[in-house]
Amino acid sequence: MIKYSNTNFYRAFRSPISNGEHQNIYIDGTRQPTHMPLEAHQIIDSWFENRFSIKARSSTIFVGTKRESVSKYAQYSSCVVKRISFPTDSKFIYSLSICDLFDEIDDLQHIDGELTKESIHQFLENAEYQITSQPDSIPSDFLGEIMVYCHNFLLQDV
């Protein structure tokens, strides 16, 4: 039986999803970007893999510490926000200075005119991403995205 942490997070889903235990279908790095340019996505994944041995953009579940921090992703009538918890062996990747990495990379592209490997790497270095296996160490008032590397997760209604 899987032991889940008592620390809860929130996630928006595009369509209704049942409560209970689910598998992370992206654990093998199969997630493709929805809005971010593929090349930037791959550069970012490579950086995270070199830093933490995890393709954070392609294999994690994106969550927030508060319902309001994920509500902007639930703007369509079919979307739903759920409370989500993770096994105690999960890894949590985040930066206290980043709310949404996609928005930050989009801003970087507008400022620089183009995205390069060097500019993306420099941006990520400056963001001071960190990894923890202790979800309660993440400040409860942090409103940014958290990328969770896990095989399973548990959903509950909010």
Model-predicted regions and their roles:
Residues R14, S85-V158:
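Active-site and NAD+-binding cores of ADP-ribose-processing enzymes
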Residues A74-S78, S97-D100:
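"Short basic amphipathic alpha-helical interaction patches in structured regions
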Residues M1-R57, L155-D157:
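ADP-ribose/NAD+-binding catalytic cleft of ART/PARP-like enzymes
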Residues T7, S58-T60, V81, L143-E145:
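Extracellular structured ligand-interaction cores
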Residues R11, F62-G64, R83:
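A structural signal for short, well-ordered beta-strand segments and their strand-loop junctions
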Residues N19, V70-Y73, K91-Y94:
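Short catalytic/ligand-binding loop motif for oxyanion handling, primarily in non-cytosolic enzymes
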Residues S77-S85:
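Cytochrome P450 catalytic domain signature, combining two hallmark sequence patches
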Residues R51-A74:
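Extended catalytic/binding region for NAD+/ADP-ribose chemistry, centered on the ART fold
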